[in-house]
UniProtKB/Swiss-Prot annotation:
Cited InterPro entries: DEAD/DEAH_box_helicase_dom, DEAD_box_RNA_helicase, GUCT, Helicase_ATP-bd, Helicase_C-like, P-loop_NTPase, RNA_helicase_DEAD_Q_motif, Znf_CCHC
Record motif DEAD box, residues: 243-246
Cellular-component GO terms for this entry: chloroplast; cytoplasm
Organism whose genome encodes this protein: Zea mays
UniProtKB keywords: ATP-binding, Chloroplast, Helicase, Hydrolase, Metal-binding, Nucleotide-binding, Plastid, Ribosome biogenesis, RNA-binding, Transit peptide, Zinc, Zinc-finger
Designated gene of the protein: RH3A
Zinc finger CCHC-type: from-to: 727-744
Protein name: DEAD-box ATP-dependent RNA helicase 3A, chloroplastic
Length: 745
């Protein structure tokens, strides 16, 4: 529960709010009472120097017994109150008809809670600090009240050449700046709005400002350049917005922001939007905001993601990620837009290139020119391709409507990054899906992520071949329905001829070819996900055999039944069911077919499976994020319990998956053991290792990754290398440490 504060008596500029302090104390008490009764009231937390917005509470989620109480802005504001849905209708908010019309034309008929909570105090001239979850409509929260007041002030000023801006919006990234510009332009096309940022022509932006402007949106670096060059005058700025203020700190803009704020008129209205409140943001608000009202729609909630985002986590081997990625997109995106987040520029390029053979995709990262970057984003927005593979440069401020799927190809560097990556879907109240890929050694990291973010993953397996085929067919059918009728006329003759010859098989063949399955799909291992491999399950009934059931027992069994299978067996895992002795293992498809036709010893069952049972998990785990997660391990350490392999099974070396840190070349999570690190023959046991025939068999024990535990440093040839963190903690909001190192967790 938000703590209640003693509110000082405040002189309101609005005569209708003269007795506001008394009513605000009553609002605070009613909020406390509603929380006691179990109401999910969004927190509007007041600092000692701010006013608690009773109106924000009432408009969000108060009960019917409060409907007739007079709010701090007078009973006139509440006249005709009929409930949340009707009260959030923009047509009932007293906005200019022109603004209402443009919003409705864009399909915006109701406000979201953060927009409604901000509207009244913003129109009253209050300085604001607002917190809300990613994707909840913060841009229009400050945009609507500013546009309303600019429209009402307009006396022909918006057409005057050379006019200086009345609104300044600062954003940490060019993508966010462009998104804010787009929202304001589409909502108020008659206002002159200019977006300025680095990486593009300075002269073009100078010329745009010289023609006259009402709203300037930009990144701090380019804003300062234009101020120093005399192209941008801030003397008439009435409204300042700091959007995603906490990220100004993360990207190193704190000095630039303070320099800009010192250039602004003292009598302006300021609004600060920030997901977290690190110490720098608090200092900024104390120094540059006037008695700000804090509207907090996050409060102490553990859940940092917007509602409607379904979270999945999928365990994979490092070398199987690219194989499975296209199948995940096919099944879970359902033909919609997907953003795949990688850790490095190299990965983004390589993953995009690998996907292009089956799915149209483009890469987006820091080495791409601004011109190409804008072409790529526009193409993605327009649906010219459906998959964008991006580094975290795109996670902040990238606002693309109707993104259906987010895939974390690599673990994020910290929980904050996970939230903002995932927040690219499920925006504006829509549903979305986010899938986290991880290796077995990173399972503890995934659990830590659940704890830090306050979310819960549904653990899934890779889609089956049948699921991929079914989804592919649905996508192709949807595409065929979009073909223009005039185009089909040219192919009717050929279609009729084929139908006469082949019947329904003609259409089936066309669907298969368009889906990318001109040839039958090969089988795929459920363990390593390699094409051409099959996963079998061996089950032994109680009372049969002697000794402990182990991978060695499985290789002994295979040696007795089929020597070729024993020579080629891949990964072997023991099942977790305590009541049944069993194991799963991989074999090449042809050998598996032969093995399934052979007779097995009594009490044993051998089957081909389409879904993995629960397995024993004895692999070591890390508890670190992203690049600080060490999955390289010790080559001298043998795997414990659950997994062993023989022959060519197991993990392959991917020499391409390297990254550099501290001047040294290291392997990333995509590294694995080479066959040189493991001998297929292994060592012979001095005792019988198989209970299926008393024969001594040998197996190879693979080296198991032995990660280093620690977020800050990893061993680099005996030397310690640490990376400083300049951002803000996701848990407490203070700078200088990550959530995993937070002393307050």
């Amino acid at each position: 529960m938000a703590s209640l504060v003693t509110l000082p008596a405040i002189a309101f500029s609005n005569p209708a709010t003269a007795s506001g302090a008394v009513r605000l104390r009553a609002a605070a008490f009613r909020c406390w009472a509603l929380r006691r009764r179990g109401w999910a009231v969004a927190a509007a937390v007041a600092s000692p120097n701010s006013v608690l917005s009773e109106h924000a509470f009432k408009r969000l989620q108060l009960g019917s017994d409060d409907e007739d109480e007079e709010g701090p802005y007078g009973s006139d504001a509440d006249e005709g109150f009929q409930g949340d849905e009707e009260e959030l209708a923009i047509a009932r908010l007293g906005l200019p008809d022109e603004l209402v019309a443009t919003l409705e034309k864009r399909g915006i008929t109701h406000l979201f809670p953060i927009q409604r909570a901000v509207l009244i105090p913003a129109l009253g001239g209050r300085d604001l600090i607002a917190r809300a979850k990613t994707g909840t409509g913060k841009t229009l929260a400050f945009g609507i009240p500013m546009i309303k007041q600019l429209m009402e002030q307009d006396d022909g000023r918006s057409t005057r050449r050379g006019r200086t801006p009345r609104v300044l919006v600062l954003a940490p990234t060019r993508e966010l700046a462009k998104q804010v510009e787009k929202e304001i332009k589409e909502s108020a096309p008659k206002l002159g709005t200019v977006c300025v940022y680095g990486g593009v022509s300075y002269n073009v932006q100078q010329n745009a400002l010289s023609r006259g402007v009402d709203v300037v949106v930009g990144t701090p670096g380019r804003i300062i350049d234009l101020i120093n060059g005399g192209s941008l005058q801030l003397g008439e700025v009435q409204y300042l917005v700091l959007d995603e203020a906490d990220q100004m700190l993360a990207v190193g803009f704190e000095e630039d922001v303070e320099t800009i704020l010192q250039q602004l008129p003292a009598d302006r209205q300021s609004m600060l939007f920030s997901a977290t409140m690190p110490s720098w943001v608090k200092k900024l608000s104390r120094r540059y905001l006037n008695n700000p009202l804090t509207i907090d729609l996050v409060g102490d909630q553990d859940e940092k993601l917007a509602e409607g985002i379904k979270l999945h986590a999928i365990p994979l081997t490092a070398t199987s990620k690219r194989t499975i990625l296209s199948d995940l997109i096919t099944v879970y995106a359902k033909g919609g837009k997907t953003i795949v987040f990688t850790r490095t520029k190299k990965d983004a390029d390589e993953v995009s290139l690998a996907l292009t053979t089956s799915i149209a995709s483009e890469a987006l990262h820091g080495d791409i020119s601004q011109h190409q970057r804008e072409r790529t984003l526009n193409g993605f927005r327009q649906g010219k391709f459906t998959v964008l593979v991006a580094t975290d440069v795109a996670a902040r401020g990238l606002d693309i409507p109707n993104v259906d799927l987010i895939i974390h190809y690599e673990l994020p560097n910290d929980p904050e990054t996970f939230v903002h990556r995932s927040g690219r879907t499920g925006r504006a109240g829509k549903a979305g899906t986010a899938i986290l890929m991880f290796t077995s050694s990173q399972k503890r990291t995934v659990m830590s992520l659940e704890r830090d973010v306050g979310c819960k993953f549904e653990f899934i397996s890779p889609p089956s071949i049948e699921e991929v085929l079914e989804s592919s067919a649905e996508h192709v059918i949807a595409t065929l329905r979009g073909v223009h009728p005039e185009s089909t006329q040219y192919f009717l003759g050929a279609a009729e001829k084929l139908t006469e010859e082949l019947g329904p098989h003609a259409l089936a063949s066309a669907l298969a070819h368009l889906s990318g399955f001109s040839q039958p799909p090969s089988s795929r291992s459920l363990i390593s996900y390699e094409q051409g491999w099959v996963t079998l399950q061996l089950t032994r009934e109680p009372g049969y055999g002697r000794g402990f059931f182990s991978p060695r027992s499985v290789t002994g069994f295979l040696s007795d039944v089929c020597s070729a299978a024993a020579d080629e067996v891949g990964k072997i895992y023991i099942t977790a069911d305590e009541n049944v002795q069993g194991a799963v293992f991989d074999l090449p498809e042809e050998i598996a077919k032969d093995l399934l036709t052979m007779e097995v010893p009594p009490g044993n069952t051998l089957t081909k499976i389409s879904k993995l049972p629960a397995l024993q998990d004895d692999s070591p785990a890390t508890d670190s994020y992203g690049r600080f997660s060490n999955d390289r391990g010790s080559r001298n350490r043998r795997s414990r319990g659950g997994g062993a392999s023989r022959g060519r099974g197991g993990w392959d070396t991917d020499s391409e998956d390297r990254y550099r840190r501290g001047g040294r070349s290291l392997r990333s999570d995509n590294d694995s053991w080479s066959d040189d690190d493991w001998s297929g023959g292994g060592r012979k046991s001095n005792r019988s290792s198989s209970s299926f025939g008393g024969r001594s068999s040998s197996y190879g024990s693979r080296g198991s990754p032995s990660p280093s535990f620690g977020v800050r440093s990893s061993s680099l040839g005996g030397r310690e290398s640490s990376r400083s963190f300049s951002g803000a903690c996701f848990n407490c909001g203070e700078s200088g440490h990550r959530a995993s190192d937070c002393p307050n967790k």
